[in-house]
C-alpha cells in the first residue's frame, strides 16, 4: 500500500506542478467551445425538452474535458517514462500489477475531475443548470475518468513513441468523444448514425452524466451504467494482462 501511495503521489504531483498546462489550458479550450457553439446555436435548437442549448452543452463539455484529460495523464506519463528509461524503476519496485494500474488510473481520475470541476466552475455562469440526480453526475464522472485513465495506460504500453500515442488519441479518443453526443442529442441523428452511436461506449458516459443534471437522457442511466461498467472491467483486465506480460515494457 505504501508503494501505491508513493506512485499515486508521484503521478499526481507530475501534472499538478504544471497545472497551467494540464488544468488551466483545457478549461480555456472548453470555454472557447461554449462561446462559439453556445452563442451561435442557443435559442435556435433544442436538444432536450425545456432545456436551453447552452445548458445542454455545458455537461457535455465538462465530461469531454474529464475524459480527454484523464486519458492524457496516464498515457503521456507512461510513454515519457518508457522513452526516458525510468519506467524500469517502477517495474522493479515491490508493487503488484494491480497497484501500478490503480496508481496511474487514480492520478488520471484526479486530473480529469480537477479539469472537469474547473470547466464547470467557469461555464456554469453562462446558463441555468439543475441537479436532478447529483449521484449520477459523480458516478459517471469518476467511472468515465477511470475508463479513460485505463485506456491511457493501455495506449502508453502499446505506443513506442509520441507519434504513435498521438495517432491513438487523434484517431480513436477524440472522434469517439466528439461523436458521443457532446454537442447534440443522438436522437436528432438519422437512423443509421443513431444505431452507430449506440456502439460507442463514450456515448453512454456522456449521456448518463447529462442525466444527472436534467433527469432526461437518450438511454436509461441504468443501461448506461451497466454498459460502462462492463467496458471498464474489460479494459482493466486487458491492462493488467499487458502489465503481467511486460508487453513492450521489458525490452
Residue map of PLM features:
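Hydrophobic transmembrane alpha-helices and immediately adjacent juxtamembrane helices
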Residues: 1-135, 139-251
Amino acid at each position: 500500500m505504501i508503494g501505491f501511495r508513493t506512485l499515486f503521489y508521484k503521478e499526481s504531483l507530475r501534472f499538478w506542478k504544471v497545472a497551467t498546462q494540464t488544468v488551466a489550458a483545457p478549461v480555456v479550450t472548453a470555454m472557447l467551445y461554449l462561446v462559439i457553439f453556445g452563442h451561435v446555436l442557443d435559442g435556435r435548437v433544442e436538444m432536450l425538452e425545456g432545456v436551453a442549448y447552452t445548458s445542454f452543452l455545458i455537461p457535455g463539455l465538462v465530461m469531454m474535458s474529464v475524459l480527454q484529460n484523464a486519458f492524457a495523464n496516464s498515457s503521456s506519463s507512461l510513454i515519457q517514462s518508457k522513452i526516458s528509461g525510468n519506467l524500469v524503476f517502477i517495474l522493479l519496485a515491490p508493487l503488484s500489477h494491480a497497484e501500478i494500474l490503480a496508481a496511474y488510473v487514480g492520478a488520471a481520475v484526479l486530473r480529469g475531475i480537477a479539469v472537469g470541476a474547473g470547466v464547470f466552475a467557469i461555464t456554469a455562469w453562462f446558463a441555468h443548470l439543475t441537479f436532478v440526480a447529483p449521484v449520477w453526475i459523480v458516478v459517471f464522472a469518476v467511472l468515465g475518468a477511470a475508463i479513460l485513465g485505463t485506456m491511457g495506460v493501455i495506449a502508453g504500453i502499446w505506443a513506442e513513441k509520441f507519434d504513435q500515442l498521438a495517432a491513438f488519441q487523434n484517431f480513436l479518443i477524440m472522434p469517439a468523444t466528439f461523436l458521443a453526443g457532446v454537442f447534440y442529442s443522438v436522437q436528432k441523428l438519422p437512423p443509421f448514425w443513431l444505431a452507430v452511436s449506440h456502439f460507442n461506449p463514450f456515448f453512454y458516459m456522456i449521456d448518463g452524466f447529462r442525466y444527472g443534471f436534467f433527469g432526461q437522457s437518450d438511454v436509461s442511466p441504468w443501461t448506461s451504467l451497466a454498459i460502462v461498467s462492463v467496458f471498464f472491467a474489460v479494459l482493466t483486465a486487458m491492462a493488467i494482462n499487458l502489465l503481467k506480460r511486460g508487453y513492450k515494457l521489458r525490452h
